[in-house]
């Protein structure tokens, strides 16, 4: 059935929950719905049905930035849950674009999430930042949502522009949330001013509602004194696996290949990833904190801090040696 038909069918059956239904019928095209009740009165039920079934649906456009491990997994989930999500919320969610660092696959009519990556490889085009932004600004939807599952500073720097043009942002990218407090407040204020959402629960805890829980406690009048936990699943996995029989950099490479690290594993090994999570959580807990107030000790040898990821792996002997001794 079309999305609009699914919406209305779902709302119809939801309104009938708990009612003394004797008989139901639905036409093959899903447009006609009939329910016979054993008892009345039905005036308020019919009024509720009309209000629910015939209210206008909002169309929400989604633009996914990043098609790596998180992005590809999100596409799988969205393909599986799209119709259910739309029926439950009454919104029509349209995957309007998939964007990586060089190319874009865009369609106002919507992309098939289950085949988006295959289409991307064949049909995505190189697009500069300005033309992409103009395309987004001209969108035909009731709302446009930017899904940032990258680790891109360039994209994080665009959040102010996204807010000013009325886009919502859902972010797994930690860089904006852990930026200096001046920039952080600017971003928050920009989204509040335009009445748009900047949601970043996915930045800490692998998608568990940790940020929400912390914020709810603060809003309830609690004072949070400390938060404890394992703040790096990557480092936890590495040190659990490491027994000296395999060079440490080989384990790092395995974790990187399996998608267990940040796109640049040096962000994990240097402590930057943990620092960003701590800053985000501390701010959610009501503390005014700067990133440089978090003390970190890096495992990355000085001569490997710059250069490419390949350079890091090719010159990791010093890291192997220091971990062998520790």
Identify what each model region corresponds to.
Residues 241-242, 249-325:
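Substrate-binding/catalytic subdomain of NAD(P)-dependent oxidoreductase enzymes
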Residues 7-20:
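Short amphipathic alpha-helix segments
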Residues 61-67, 71-164:
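N-terminal glycine-/serine-/threonine-rich beta1-alpha1-beta2 phosphate-ribose binding loop
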Residues 2-6, 326:
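Short, small-residue-biased leader/transition segments that mark boundaries at the very start
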Residues 152-164, 174-200, 206, 211-214:
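Rossmann-fold NAD(P)-binding glycine/threonine-rich loop
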Residues 10-11, 40-56:
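Charge-rich, low-aromatic oligomerization/scaffolding segments with amphipathic character
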